[in-house]
Amino acid sequence: QSHQWFAWPLGQATSMGIHESQSLFWENRIVKSKSFSKRFFKKFVSAGCTLNNYFELWKSINHLEAGLNRVEADELTYGLHILVRTELEIDLIEGGLPAEDIPEEWNKRYGELLGIKPSNDSEGCLQDVHWSEGAFGYFPSYLLGHLISAQISSQMERDIGLIDDLIQNGEYQKI
């Protein structure tokens, strides 16, 4: 590997939004596609999957339901998970929310936006490591990553063809 661009902007991630877009592209555009389920269904079965066909696998992977965990959230509610965290960070940093009130406020907002309530703080405000590591302001990077990955997907299809066809044919090197 060449290190000629080390410590230069060209050798670094452009932004955390771009960085997050790379994994989110594979998670949301590749793995959640029907083509992926169809191509890899037999491997899932050999690993213990008990679903009857690739369509059931695809439906299972793309199931929509509000859940407590941001990492496991569906595409419809993911943005709401980010919104709760971002708004709480802003309120905390601006002084409008004392740290000791975060669990109660978290639960309130999850109830209002997602219609669910954590049974304990581990399922709620303590589920992410970001705040304990001092990583305030990071959560919007995930939402930007989602938006950027959608743009990448759209441009990629204009440039090299339908991503579903590439997946179906196993042409991952083009992706």
Segments (PLM) and residue ranges:
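Catalytic Zn2+-binding segment of zinc metalloproteases
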Residues: 1-6
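General structural signal for secondary-structure boundaries
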Residues: 29-36, 50-57, 98-101, 116
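All-alpha helical catalytic cores of prenyl diphosphate-utilizing isoprenoid enzymes
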Residues: 44-67, 71-84, 116-119
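C-terminal, non-catalytic "cap/extension" segments appended to globular domains
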Residues: 82, 86-175
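Post-HExxH zinc-binding segment in Zn-dependent metallohydrolases
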Residues: 11-50
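Hydrophobic alpha-helical scaffolding
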Residues: 12-16, 51, 70, 74, ...
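Short, mixed-charge, low-aromatic patches
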Residues: 40-47, 59-66, 100-111, 168-169
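Generic structural "secondary-structure junction" signal
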Residues: 7-8, 12, 20, 128-133
